[in-house]
């Protein structure tokens, strides 16, 4: 399962971390992993390219991605994060309804 932990400080997004694999199909053929990766990486890239928000991101092995927003997020950055979370929930709900198995879990943590 892909676990995405979204960090909030005083109710505002301060970052997120993603770990794991969906397990929907074999590596290289897993459309759930691909969809989740595209949503998260595009969000990081969009915040960097389309806002003046500071972004610190680290990508690792085994589906690991960590991203923080040291100066907080602008309204545009918040909207991009909201869109990412909407996309992740829709991917998860659609595939879970098909198989009865959760592939993506989104958790929120106040830091």
Task: Report the location of each language-model feature.
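Short, conserved glycine- and acidic-residue-centered signature motifs
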Residues: 32, 36
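N-terminal intrinsically disordered, cationic/polar leader segments
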Residues: 1-29, 41, 45-111
